[in-house]
Amino acid sequence: PGATRPQYGGTLRVELRQNAETPDPPALLGGGFTIARWEAGRLAVYEADENAGGGRPFLGSVEFHLGRALRDQASDLDLGKADVVELGPGELRRQPAGRRVWSSSPVRVLALVFAPRYEDARVREALALAVDRSAIHTVLLQRQGEISGALLPQWLSGYAFLFPAAADLGRARQLAPGARPITLGVSDAAARPIAERIALNARDAGLVVSVTPQTANADVVLAELRIASADPAKALAQIAEALGLPAPPREASPNTAPNAAANASPEQAYAAERALLEGFRVIPLIHLPDVYGVGARVKGGPGIAPSGEWRFDNLWLEGARP
């Protein structure tokens, strides 16, 4: 019976892929912890706050180890060197029966993003129509997430289903003649099989696409963008900024408040997103959840909110020593 009673103390070890480009430490919801150490892109350590408003959390501290490959994370979880690790589709498939898995709502969008210099709108549209999202979702992603032609996920906007996501090879073949070869950059090795599948789809439409790990000079990049706000208009503006696209249009009038974007109606938000997607400079493919494998000594939880943010105030470690 004592094993299930919350215990104080112990260090929760979390491993993530986030790398040296990450400027800020992971955000924690719910309070209860203060950051004690931050080595940018490598390590973040949080200590329990004895004076937390909601009471001291059970965990003594939390360590985030960043820049860890998915395969290494899975190995560390199996060996008991980590308590919480990210799971890609391949790792999720290999999880032993009975292991707990935490999953958020779809909070990342996988998309093809063309370089500003790539001017041929017909070829951009041809590639958009050639991609077989369904095969990628079923085979490569093990049905994780949701197929979509929208930047914002359905749970957030309510209108994602209005953007077409079906392949149309016939139309793609009509647009493809005369297209020069395209380079598709993918920096994340875990996403390379998806890029290779897109190249195969493109070939079926008469396009020549070669996959490269170099993204700087690629014609188009397979990118992953995080939905960073629960407000549709704000989330859309942040995605546009991250992609270097013009800010989404909004109704302008002398009385427009500075935060008018945050108060946009669903119709305005839909129109703004449609404007961003016109011209096929960005081609949304699939919305993905954050998925984590959890070690046996972790109790309580889940430790993530539907928004994907961390929440450790209701976790404890079995066998922890205060």
Placement of each model-derived feature along the sequence:
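Structural transition elements
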Residues: 142, 146-178, 186-193
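Alpha-helical secondary-structure segments
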Residues: 11-16, 61, 79, 106-149, ...
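Paired acidic/hydrophobic, glycine-rich loop segments that form the ligand-binding mouth/hinge
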Residues: 82-89, 219-224, 284
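Short, well-ordered beta-strand elements
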Residues: 10-17, 31-35, 44-45, 60-66, ...
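Short, solvent-exposed loop/beta-turn-alpha elements that line the ligand-binding surface or hinge
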Residues: 3-4, 16, 21-38, 54-58, ...
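Ligand-site clamp/hinge motif
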Residues: 51-94
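Ligand/substrate-recognition segments at binding pockets and active sites
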Residues: 173-228
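Bilobed "Venus flytrap"/periplasmic-binding protein-like clamshell domains
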Residues: 18-22, 30-54, 169-175, 181-198
